[in-house]
């Protein structure tokens, strides 16, 4: 039977939602593929039958740790949350800039250096990581109405010099054409090499730095900033050729080489690393196209983009595995040491798909594999973290890095929820909403029973009957009542993760790396820059959603 597109206007029955009222089921489209019977056939018993009112509902959530998230009539108690969000945003931005040199609070930090944390003992995080620094700078450029240009230029200057510095992996560029030394993840705050044993190389750093610097280049062009003669680059072309190009060369040369993951624990091939490498290459090709620059380097980049894309989506490489309906973060340890679930997969999706221009890249925010990864992280971590025990199934919870984590922020014992993981869940859902609203896209809900609709059936809707093994989809057309109420539900789910975080943040707004899974109190490295950055990311995309509604 050929593919059919069926519109059901004023379909028999009503769609009852958990907001104290019901609206007629109008402008809902069901795409059907090769069904033997129409879904309105009583004998089929599909999701929308003519046996009476449909019982598909939006899930309701009432209490979380004693805090009203929204009541049974859907009334959102947002005043306390809104007040806290505003205050926490202010604290987060202040703390981020305190952790960037030159800092009045930490004067030993060199200009342009972004420290991971001011903590120097138990644990010692008083270093600069290429990854953390790049993610922080990326957020500053993305979210600030007028980012501190001197901070950005100082960061570029640090990047320029680190690339040309020797480290334990090898000689810096300029001494050799080999880029292997760019895989060193960690440096001292005075820009000297960190020479102790560590998990090297980490191949995501150059990619993340490229992404951040390409965004700086765009800002400099748009703002007409005069670079002057203070630094070793006088134009955006210099910045690209002298910094970004070397990081891209590293990706071309080493993308298919093993390295340590972003948690610095496992040496192998990782979803996070590969997806951000793909993004860096893709954004660089956009740079060449926009600047109308030609280079033989471009064809190498195109081939690398093709190669990484193919590698990521090839089932043989294990990131997409028929056994699971979520993304496997590091396939080499799935099934043996871990489940493969990892918050880093959502971090990667959010980092890469922060704008519609990246929608052609795989694993976009609305990809069922991405959304189901969030669902499964919630499913696992709801039970392993006692502070989540009182949370309803359809509300946000405290999330950690991966279910098998044993790092407690000081040593090895029992893993805890992380601030950045919990904020990433919110960011993912806000991104999902923003994408559909800003681009006026319909909501597409998978209706097959191969578990690809787990996010929708377990977190958003109840009684969402599947349509068999064929690929059927429920389409909620943009700006219809069905669409709007579902978007509201997803927004409330996104907010509920921040409500959960709020319950464990002190009055001073300090964000450490983790919060204890039993007591809920902050622990691990204090004033973690990545924690503040992750909150800022969630806050900012939330504001963009509110402005677009």
From Swiss-Prot:
Q: What InterPro entries does UniProt report for this protein, alphabetically?
A: 6-hairpin_glycosidase_sf, 6hp_glycosidase-like_sf, GH15-like, Glucoamylase, Glucoamylase_active_site
Q: Which GO terms describe its cellular component?
A: fungal-type vacuole; prospore membrane
> So where's the catalytic machinery, residue-wise?
261 (proton acceptor), 264 (proton donor)
Query: Which PROSITE patterns does the entry link to?
Result: GLUCOAMYLASE
Protein name as it appears in the record: Glucoamylase, intracellular sporulation-specific
Positions bound to substrate:
198
Q: Which domain of life is it from?
A: Eukaryota
Q: What class of enzyme is it?
A: hydrolase
| Claim: Transmembrane is one of the keywords in the record | no
Q: Which organism is it from?
A: Saccharomyces cerevisiae (strain ATCC 204508 / S288c) (Baker's yeast)
Record-listed E.C. numbers: 3.2.1.3
| Catalytic reactions of this protein | Hydrolysis of terminal (1->4)-linked alpha-D-glucose residues successively from non-reducing ends of the chains with release of beta-D-glucose
